[in-house]
């Protein structure tokens, strides 16, 4: 096989609740790509200021002063209804969209969680493109194993909006297993992947042998993750403060954001320390003056606060083992820990206890292993990784509502995918000429208790007594775990098909519009970036010219000196005026550059006379401005013409 060009490469993306990561296969090895800040993971945080949109570390840094417009953990909201948001606590506003889905409001604008995910993916895409020096179009994106069909489609939509062709959706524990087991030889092994991340918990049982990775069973909880551990500490902090001062901080977004950051920091510290001090000065005030939050949190107290959360991970483990037909935990060869929360000693110990004292594997980086697995899957699809077969499963049963509101599964959970299955149904009433097919996903006996994925109608059925018409319903699940459902009347041949849409509240037209908006804004974003680079170069020119003026000003004529000082003043005033266009800044920049050549000549003469060398001259600032500045990662929200700035 020939060399894969950058545009043909398939990157692997772990779109996480707390952090995201991107990797790629190079020379048969998966490599994690660092972002522009030099980090191997990027915070899944998006912030909206008055003039710009920030993503990643820049967004996270300003959260304390912009809490209501800083969006984090949006992955926990994807595919969820507004009335199902009781467990999600955040300082930003969540509101019901027209269709009842949970959306997010920032700076007065409504955003689907799908859009927020797309903004994070854009940043990840830029990280990969900076590394390759070429456009990147294709990606494998991971999702929690227990994500339902609509959430998977929503994730794929986010990739589309970000300008990516999502060639495969892969379950996070399965990706981790790929990363763990790729170089483990041909020996048959049964492994468990215990994945406790920022927003979700998954557990998968896999058999690995001779390059075949077969998922035997999966289970989980999409409402359990590190965010819940943070919330437990936050509640403890706020309750302690209330008891001490009588002040309730729950309705103070800025205080809540500060407490959240402190809680997360304390949680991380307690993985390696027995106690930590939490101090937040000036957290609030009353008639007596400023109030400070200060308390000591021990590891034992923290473990007590979250013991119920840790215990909630055990029941899914039991169900996964039962579904896989494993009655004895000694049959498990390896337990692989994934997700940042698995660094917590109490979590490690509870997993060890449940699996019969088996020490969990610590040979993988829990923050990077999922992205590495996604990159390996990308390598499989390109042919860069050979002799590997991945067999995943449907995490939840899929079926339709039948007479009496009963849920009738067509595809049972843990069925290997891709798969296709048909079943014949009939009418419930005499003379019925149309049927409504309601598609559900879940494990409850009554349809209403499961997740409604979508519905469609099949009309034009020939009138006949009830039970006579034969309507064939077919479920087709592709390798991404995304469902297509069709219904066909065998007598008339009439057929209706539905592809389950995401629960992100976005129609295909809206998604297309967002994609177009992103493309249209690319030129504007580039202008904004060039403007910032130009301003940075101008500031550097002013600084170096003033230094040279101080060193060599007495060696040029007073007229030249006055001219340079005037040019510096004009450029500085231009930079301080937000309405100055890039063209005007460039003109003032060029004018000062030209005048500063006199200083360069004076410096050269001084060096020649003294026989020494120096590089602190104004002429040192010449050249391409792009080569002297660091890229600033943000996007302009306002769509004003650049010249008006």
Swiss-Prot record:
Family annotation (SUPFAM superfamilies): Actin-like ATPase domain, Heat shock protein 70kD (HSP70), C-terminal subdomain, Heat shock protein 70kD (HSP70), peptide-binding domain
InterPro entries according to UniProt: ATPase_NBD, Chaperone_DnaK, Heat_shock_70_CS, HSP70_C_sf, HSP70_peptide-bd_sf, Hsp_70_fam
Listed Low complexity bias regions: 609-623
Residue numbers bearing the Phosphothreonine modification: 200
Disordered, as annotated region: 603-645
Gene3D superfamilies per record: 1.20.1270.10, 3.30.420.40, Actin, Chain A, domain 4 (3.90.640.10), Substrate Binding Domain Of DNAk, Chain A, domain 1 (2.60.34.10)
Induction comment from the UniProt entry of this chain: By stress conditions e.g. heat shock.
Record key words, sorted: ATP-binding, Chaperone, Nucleotide-binding, Phosphoprotein, Stress response
Coiled-coil regions listed: none
Membrane-spanning residues: none
Keyword Nucleotide-binding: yes
GO molecular-function terms, A-Z: ATP binding; ATP-dependent protein folding chaperone; unfolded protein binding
Bias (Basic and acidic residues): 625-645
PROSITE patterns linked to this entry: HSP70_1, HSP70_2, HSP70_3
Domain of life per record: Bacteria
NCBIfam families from the UniProt entry: PRK00290.1 (NF001413), PRK05183.1 (NF003520), prok_dnaK (TIGR02350)
Annotated function: Acts as a chaperone.
Family: Belongs to the heat shock protein 70 family.
Protein name as catalogued: Chaperone protein DnaK
Organism per entry: Anaplasma marginale (strain St. Maries)
Encoding gene, per UniProt annotation: dnaK
């Amino acid at each position: 096989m020939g060399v894969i060009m950058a545009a043909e490469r398939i990157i692997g993306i772990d779109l996480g609740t707390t952090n995201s990561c991107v990797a790629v296969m190079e020379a048969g090895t998966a490599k994690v790509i660092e972002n522009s800040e030099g980090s191997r993971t990027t915070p899944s945080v998006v912030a909206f200021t008055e003039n710009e949109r920030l993503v990643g570390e820049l967004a996270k840094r300003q959260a304390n002063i912009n809490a209501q417009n800083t969006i984090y953990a949006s992955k926990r909201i994807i595919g969820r209804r507004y009335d199902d948001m009781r467990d999600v606590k955040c300082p930003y506003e969540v509101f019901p969209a027209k269709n009842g889905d949970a959306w997010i409001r920032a700076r007065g604008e409504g955003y689907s969680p799908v859009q927020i995910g797309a903004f994070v993916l854009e940043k990840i895409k830029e990280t990969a493109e900076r590394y390759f020096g070429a456009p990147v179009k294709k990606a494998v994106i991971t999702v929690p194993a227990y994500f339902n069909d609509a959430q998977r489609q929503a994730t794929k939509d986010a990739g589309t909006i970000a300008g990516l062709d999502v060639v495969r959706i892969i379950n996070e524990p399965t990706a981790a297993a790929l990363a763990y087991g790729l170089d483990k030889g041909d020996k048959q092994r049964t492994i468990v992947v215990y994945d406790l991340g920022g927003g979700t918990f998954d557990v998968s049982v896999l058999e690995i042998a001779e390059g075949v990775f077969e998922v035997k069973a999966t289970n989980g909880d999409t409402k359990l993750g590190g965010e819940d551990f943070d919330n437990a500490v936050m509640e403890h902090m706020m309750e302690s403060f209330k008891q001490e001062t009588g002040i309730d901080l729950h309705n103070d977004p800025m205080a809540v954001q500060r407490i959240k950051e402190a809680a997360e920091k304390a949680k991380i510290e307690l993985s390696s320390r027995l106690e930590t001090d939490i101090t937040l000065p000036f957290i609030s005030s009353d008639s007596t003056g400023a109030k400070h939050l200060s308390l000591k949190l021990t590891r034992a107290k923290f473990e007590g606060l979250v013991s119920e959360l840790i215990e909630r991970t055990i029941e899914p483990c039991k169900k996964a083992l039962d579904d896989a037909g494993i009655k004895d935990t000694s049959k498990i060869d390896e337990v692989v820990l994934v997700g940042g929360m698995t660094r917590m000693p109490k979590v490690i110990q509870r997993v060890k206890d449940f699996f019969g004292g088996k020490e969990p594997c610590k040979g993988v980086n829990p923050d990077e292993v999922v992205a590495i697995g996604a990159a390996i899957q990308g390598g499989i699809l390109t042919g860069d990784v050979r002799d590997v077969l991945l067999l995943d499963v449907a995490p939840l049963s899929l079926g339709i509502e039948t007479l009496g509101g009963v849920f009738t599964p067509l595809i049972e959970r843990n069925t290997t995918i891709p798969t296709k299955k048909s079943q014949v149904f009939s009418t419930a009433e005499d003379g019925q000429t149309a049927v409504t097919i309601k598609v559900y996903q879940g494990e409850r006996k009554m349809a209403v208790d499961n997740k409604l994925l979508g519905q469609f109608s099949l009309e034009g059925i020939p009138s006949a007594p009830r039970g006579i018409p034969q309507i064939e319903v077919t479920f087709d699940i592709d390798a991404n775990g995304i469902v297509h459902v069709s219904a066909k009347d065998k007598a008339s041949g009439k057929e209706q098909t539905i592809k389950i849409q995401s629960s992100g509240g976005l129609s295909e037209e809206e998604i297309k519009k967002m994609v177009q908006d992103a493309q249209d804004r690319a030129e504007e974003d580039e202008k904004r970036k060039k403007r910032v680079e130009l301003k940075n170069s101008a500031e550097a020119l002013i600084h170096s010219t003033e230094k040279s003026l101080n060193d060599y000003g007495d060696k040029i004529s007073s007229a030249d000196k006055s001219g340079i000082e005037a040019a510096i003043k004009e450029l500085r005033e231009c930079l301080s005026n937000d309405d100055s266009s890039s063209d005007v800044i460039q003109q003032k920049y060029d004018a000062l550059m030209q005048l500063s050549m006199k200083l360069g000549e004076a410096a050269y003469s001084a060096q020649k006379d003294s026989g020494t060398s120096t590089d602190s001259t104004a002429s040192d600032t010449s050249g391409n401005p792009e080569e002297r500045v660091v890229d600033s990662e943000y996007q302009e929200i306002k769509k004003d013409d650049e010249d008006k700035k």
